Every structure is written in structure tokens, then in C-alpha cells.
Amino acid sequence: MIVGVVLAKNAQKAVEKIKSGEADLYEVRLDHFSSFDGLEELEPFAPNLIFTFRSYEEGGRREASDEERLRVYKRVLELYPAYVDVGLNSGIAERVVKEAREKRVGVVLSYHNFEETPDFWELLGVVKAMEALEPDVMKIVTMARSLGDNLRIARLYEGRENVVAFCMGSLGRLSRLISALLAPFTYASLDEEAAPGQLTVEELRRAIEVVGDGR
């Protein structure tokens, strides 16, 4: 499945992008919102939505306190989305996981490294830390500094079915295709890149079709 990343300034604009999109799921980046009025407009689409409110340190668009982010997470959980995504190193990770479990909403626990792709054992340590919180999906995203980084992060798929792992940057595009084939879902842009090297939904579908035809 392909997740289209929704970058919008409010719920109404997010709805417009979802309606015109061709993805299977949509990640709504709440850190891009300038206002949280009208969040209920997203409720009809909730079964196909992943809500995330990234902190500034995790690549979020703006600074927001943990308490503000937690309040917004609680509001979107009332819409019963498919998932909420919260950063492993966020100060509210455990609380968001707990709130989501009470609502029976899926949890994506994420880790982003915008500088490099750490060595494999450090990546494995991230996975182990995530597993302690028992998320439904573990998302590990790093920055590719070499083509070899694609293969290193792909090793995280060995023996795991709930991992989404890939590299950002132009050197990491191979890992995005690997992710599309091995992960429960992977991410693509609707109209503008949410991360360096991100493919569009159309580009990713085309690439998957080519690889599929070659089997």
C-alpha cells in the first residue's frame, strides 16, 4: 500500500488533497497545520488516515510543546483513524501509545535521522527500543550518504513483517522501492516532497509495476 503525505495548513485543505489523491492511505502532517479548527471534517476519511504531529526535533514544521501535541493527538484519536504516528524519542510517545490502545487505534512508532544512516547494530537498537512499546508498525527513516546505506537499512526487514524502513535523499531512492515491496506500506508525495528524495504516488506505482512485471 502507498501512503500519500498530506501537507496542508488546515483540515479543509487536507480534505481537498485527500479527495484528489490516488493513494491507499494518507498521512496527515498535523505539524503543518496553522489551525486545528474543523478537525471533524476529516472523520469520513479516518479509516484511511494516519495522523502525526512531529516535534520540531523530528523534522516537524513548527515548534510545539509536548502538551500541545498530546492534546491534538487526543482530538484526532476521537476520529478513530487507521493509525497515529508518534516519534520514539518524543516526550509523549508512551502516552500517545496508551491513548491509542484505549481507542483501539493502530500505532506507528517512528524514528528519523536526518544526518546519516547509523551502523546496523545501532539501527537494531532502535528496533529493540520500539519493540518494547509494542507498536503495530515500526518506521525507521535515515539519510542515505552512500548507496550501501540502502542495503543496510533493508536488513531490518529480515524476520519482521511490521517494519517500514527506508532512506531519504537522492541516494536513498532504491530503499524506497525496496520498502514498497517489503513493508506493510510506504510513503509518497501528493504534490510536494515531505522528505528529500521522496517519490510521487504515480512514480512509486509505476516503479512497483515495472518490478512486478519482471518477476
Swiss-Prot record:
Active-site residues annotated for this sequence: H112 (proton donor/acceptor), K139 (schiff-base intermediate with substrate)
One Gene Ontology MF term: 3-dehydroquinate dehydratase activity
Pathway: Metabolic intermediate biosynthesis; chorismate biosynthesis; chorismate from D-erythrose 4-phosphate and phosphoenolpyruvate: step 3/7
Known catalytic reactions: 3-dehydroquinate = 3-dehydroshikimate + H2O
Family classification: Belongs to the type-I 3-dehydroquinase family.
Subunit structure: Homodimer.
Name of the protein described by the UniProt record: 3-dehydroquinate dehydratase
Organism field: Thermococcus onnurineus (strain NA1)
